[in-house]
Amino acid sequence: MSILQERHKKLAFYGVPSTGTAGYVLTRMKFFTKLTTNKNPIEHNVKYVDEASQRNDVVGYNTSIDYGFDDYANDQVLADIAQIHNEELTGDQAKRSILLVDTYTGKAILRDYSVIPGTSGDDVNVYTYSGSFKSCGEITKGTVTTSDNYATVTFTADT
């Protein structure tokens, strides 16, 4: 029997900077009202003179994740993204690792992203932020383990 996959079981974790050996702690991304992945394929299109149709091939990806969140105090992930917005950080100061986890299979994909600020304060009831995470590197496939019910995870890359 097929199982409908629920959105809340596809989790995202953000690399909050730390002084540990990895340089970050993968912390669950909570309070997000939007986390939409865009694959943005890079295409090679060619039309040969002896063929009626054009050929299209995907030659790469420029993956991005559009985000939006309600700003909650005392949340490390939200505070870090808000700091990038508010202080207009650039370059490596605005790069973070994001891990996407499928709790149905235990599979995970880790990738570095640049935090691209968009808007802030566009709701009259609560303070909000939105923008995009844009890929800056290849994906690393693997699995995760957790000892705190997915508040944080440890990623192990496939070999």
Language-model features: locations:
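Solvent-exposed edge beta-strands and adjacent loop segments
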Residues: 1-68, 115-127
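Short, flexible beta-strand-to-coil junctions
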Residues: 16-19, 70-72, 100-107
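Secondary-structure transition/turn motif
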Residues: 30, 70-71, 133-137
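Ordered, amphipathic secondary-structure segments that act as subunit-interaction surfaces
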Residues: 63-84
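Short, acidic/charged, Gly/Pro-enriched secondary-structure junctions
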Residues: 77-109
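"Short basic amphipathic alpha-helical interaction patches in structured regions
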Residues: 79-88, 112-114, 129-130, 147-148
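Short beta-strand and beta-hairpin "edge-sheet" elements
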Residues: 99-139
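Intrinsically disordered, low-complexity terminal/linker regions enriched in Pro/Ser/Gly
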Residues: 143-159
